[in-house]
Curated annotation (Swiss-Prot):
Name of encoding gene: acpP
Keyword terms, alphabetized: Cytoplasm, Fatty acid biosynthesis, Fatty acid metabolism, Lipid biosynthesis, Lipid metabolism, Phosphopantetheine, Phosphoprotein
Organism field: Phytoplasma mali (strain AT)
Name assigned to this protein: Acyl carrier protein
Entry's Gene Ontology molecular function annotations: acyl binding; acyl carrier activity
PANTHER family: ACYL CARRIER PROTEIN, CARRIER DOMAIN-CONTAINING PROTEIN
Amino acid sequence: MIFQKIQEFIAEQLSIDKNNIKLESDLKEDLGIDSIDAVGLIIKIEEFFKLEVSDETLQKFKNVKDILEYIQQHVDNYDYLEKK
C-alpha cells in the first residue's frame, strides 16, 4: 500500500503513468524529478503519512525505495497502513 501511494503521488506530481515508477527508479535520472517536484512530492507524503521530512533527508532520497524505507521507518502505525 505504501509503495502504491508513493507511485500515485509521483505520477500526479510529474504527470506520468504510475506503472513506469518502480522501486529502483532513480528520482532524477529515471523520473526527471527536479527540486520543485521533490518539494511538491514531499509535501504530499508528509500530509498523507503525517510525517516531517527534513531538507537534509530529502537530499538523501536517490530512488523510490529510499522514500519507501524512510516512510516504513518513521510511520507510527505502519502495520495499520499496510492493511488499509
